[in-house]
Amino acid sequence: RKRKSFPCRLEIIWIIKVAPTCGIVNTEDYIDGEDEPRCFYNPLRTTAKLVWFAKGYLEYRFPNAGIQNGRVRRLELSAELCSEAPDYNMEWPSDITLWINQREAGTWTCPSDFGGRRGKLNPDWWEDKNTQYGKLKVWTLEENGTYLDGKKVNDVSVTDYCLADGPFISVRIGVKEDAKHQGGVNLFGNSFGDYPQDIVMRILYE
């Protein structure tokens, strides 16, 4: 069996559909200010380390070269996430959904836009009143179903996601338009929050 690991930096955004409150920061400053979706098209987004939006989704694309002639046994995707409120709010739930190749892979109801203490990695200029950290969530696609943090969420097999069929693997993170808790998303890169990682995909295949 072989393993592939693909870290995907936050700035490599392919499809954007977001609404305020929203924004992007890098390790130095805000990119184009806050609450302006146009900032997601600024060339400086290539330095993004934290992105947030109240509604909508972002889509990332991962390579699938090398698995076309094999059998994928497992896909694991991990990211640090939380809800998005103005500043931060410990009572702000959000139903955050992951889609893989346009197929739903499970929803996590985040309880909070976390704050009250500084994120372990946050730069000094990031104000205490802002979102500080998230939770590291892990989605796993197995042959017998899909799991979130080790708990089975549906019976969709890893083969049902058709990972090798297209030229890439689509990963979409967002909040459904009809979600019960429409509390937005904060998505942390390797220089904000508590975990020194970007979005990471791991594939086990043979």
Task: Kindly give the residue locations of the regions a language model identified.
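Extended, solvent-exposed segments with strong compositional bias
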Residues: C39-W52, C110-A164, H181
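Mid-protein regulatory/catalytic core that forms ligand/cofactor-binding pockets
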Residues: R3-P123, E127
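Generic hydrophobic, helix-prone segments enriched in Leu/Val/Ile
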Residues: R1, V72-L75, L136, Q197-I203
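Proprotein-processing/basic-patch segments
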Residues: G174-E206
